[in-house]
Amino acid sequence: MISTACWRDCMPQTVNKQAVAAAFGRAARSYNQHAELQRQCGERLLEHARPGNALRVLDAGCGTGWFSQRWRAGGHWVTALDLSEKMLQHARENQAADCYLPGDIEALPFADASFDRCWSNLAVQWCSSLPLALRELRRVTKPGGQVLFSTLTEGSLKEVSAAWQQIGRSAPLNRFASLPVIEQAAGSLALTLAGYTLTLAFPDVLSALRSLKGIGATHLHQGRSNGMISRRELQQLEQVWQRDARGCLLSYQLVSGVIERE
């Protein structure tokens, strides 16, 4: 099993959980307007879920509760958990789940074997230790149940990196794990991974950048060393950003992960 120390060697960044929660809290009201990535990624992840009746489901990193609602509509009892109180408040207002709890995926506030399905759509990339997060999700899953998670992987947002490089700046992006690192993080857990690319298009660079901010994904683990984007920089980015007939592109390397709980 890969150690926490080794994970940090692979992904050298310290996650400030309060700052992450604050970033997503600021995005809570506008989140669903910008969450096409989360919806498409979650739909792909749902394809790996085994059917069942009246399941107890944990939505870990629930955000506004979009997929909590999907699970609940299927007749399942859903517990929504998130770092951000504001996200939970939004989920509660939408009656997305049956129970709402603030909490950290790396220290889940549940007894062993509490859930039939543990669902975490695009949340574990905000964890300090993926090995610990996966162990916690498995711990609270009942024997015969499933852990279903998705995350961003190495190579995501190549258009952002390339555009910033062309104007002589380093891209204000977090690092994401490679598939081999994710496999190592699972250790002896019964994990299967399915990787794929998802590309979204936007009418202009500002819209593309706003989509990142709108889902709360602008918090940098290494801090905001690059500051705000100036009008001149935005104009330069417009000139060099990769695009096609649909508009300015944002490409995500994604993975759906399934852990079968024996």
From Swiss-Prot:
Sorted UniProt keywords: Biotin biosynthesis, Methyltransferase, S-adenosyl-L-methionine, Transferase
Its biological purpose: Converts the free carboxyl group of a malonyl-thioester to its methyl ester by transfer of a methyl group from S-adenosyl-L-methionine (SAM). It allows to synthesize pimeloyl-ACP via the fatty acid synthetic pathway.
Gene Ontology biological process terms in this record: biotin biosynthetic process; methylation
EC number: 2.1.1.197
Pathway(s) of this molecule: Cofactor biosynthesis; biotin biosynthesis
Enzyme class: transferase
Pfam family, one: Methyltransf_11
The protein, known as: Malonyl-[acyl-carrier protein] O-methyltransferase
Family: Belongs to the methyltransferase superfamily.
Catalytic activity: malonyl-[ACP] + S-adenosyl-L-methionine = malonyl-[ACP] methyl ester + S-adenosyl-L-homocysteine
CDD domains membership: AdoMet_MTases
Species, as recorded: Erwinia pyrifoliae (strain DSM 12163 / CIP 106111 / Ep16/96)
PANTHER family in UniProt: MALONYL-[ACYL-CARRIER PROTEIN] O-METHYLTRANSFERASE (PTHR43464:SF94), METHYLTRANSFERASE (PTHR43464)
GO MF terms, alphabetically ordered: carboxyl-O-methyltransferase activity; malonyl-CoA methyltransferase activity; S-adenosylmethionine-dependent methyltransferase activity
